[in-house]
Amino acid sequence: MLGRCFPPNTKEKQQLRMIKLCDPAESELSPFLITLTLAVLLAEYLTGIIANGFITAIHAAEWVQNKSVSTSGRILVFLSVSRIALQSLMMLEITISSTSLSFYSEDAVYYAFKISFIFLNFCSLWFAAWLSFFYFVKIANFSYPLFLKLRWRISGLIPWLLWLSVFISFSHSMFCINICTGYCDNSFPIHSSNSTEKTYFSEISVVSLAFFFNLGIVIPLIMFILAAILLILSLKRHTLHMGSNATGSKDPSMEAHIGAIKATSYFLILYIFNAVALFIYLSNMFDINSLWNTLCQIIMAAYPASHSILLIKDNPGLRRAWKQLQHRLHLYPKQWTL
């Protein structure tokens, strides 16, 4: 959808685009697989919207009640709002592209979807990276003076870093409009599943694309990986120290540390899979209708939903609020039957 390559700007561009979208020769998926893929994607979108909507509602209620919100809660609000917008956008794009192809193929509509998609994805990547970094600074057990100073100042820095991430993501999304379009020239070939047609990037576009992806995807990816690995190592070292001093009975603190290690490991795996899928999808490495491209879409849709569910499961406040919500939902049918 958002990773297509188009020919240069001409009067026939919209017609050529629709031909490329509708050409059955490029489709590698059967009607059954297409229907199954759409069903899976819609289920992932709805799950992500519900989970992130719950996180947003809980912290918004905390903000209204206490006139303030914790630093981690602020990051979660930014992250969940960006994911709600992203999941809604992707679901809307599937609906429009499936029901009104002529409208979707218009330049203004297509580029609005593309820019919004990249902006929200980059925001999500940055916010998740800052969440990992914040947990690392607050939980990791290091005694370096610079680290201790950072721990003391991190709560005041996070709001500025979040808005800086929004600005960076917006700048990249506006910049991408000139570099994420393929050109049929004779400079740099990109793999296409159709052997009768070759798609090319101009040399300038290739350099710009590499710079663009490095800043938008690789930097938050590296930051997330480093923060998560250092946090896991710190928790592992502390767990081993606690184990050596254990008396034999189960220590709740040790179990909490082990749970934190597992949760951080899951977050790290999900984040890496999502970043790689996004990079492949935006790079046009595969045809838009190929199985690999579809797999990337499924991964990108699954990440916000699965990560948010894990956040609810591993956060005591969110987990308690979710159980209370489930309890109230179970009570409503009983009240109606009385």
Swiss-Prot record:
Which stretches of this protein does UniProt put in the Cytoplasmic compartment? 52-74, 138-156, 227-262, 313-338
Q: Report one GO cellular component.
A: membrane
Residues carrying sugar? 194
Q: List the Extracellular topological domains.
A: 1-30, 96-116, 178-205, 284-291
Asked if Ligase is a keyword of the record, the answer is: no
Q: How does it sit in the membrane?
A: Multi-pass membrane protein
Q: Could you confirm whether the keyword Membrane appears in this record?
A: yes
Q: Which GO terms describe its molecular function?
A: bitter taste receptor activity; G protein-coupled receptor activity
GO biological process assignments: detection of chemical stimulus involved in sensory perception of bitter taste
Q: Which InterPro entries match?
A: TAS2R (IPR007960)
Keyword line: G-protein coupled receptor, Glycoprotein, Membrane, Receptor, Sensory transduction, Taste, Transducer, Transmembrane, Transmembrane helix
Where is it located? Membrane
- Misc. comment: Most taste cells may be activated by a limited number of bitter compounds; individual taste cells can discriminate among bitter stimuli.
Could you say which protein family the record assigns here? Belongs to the G-protein coupled receptor T2R family.
What's the protein name? Taste receptor type 2 member 39
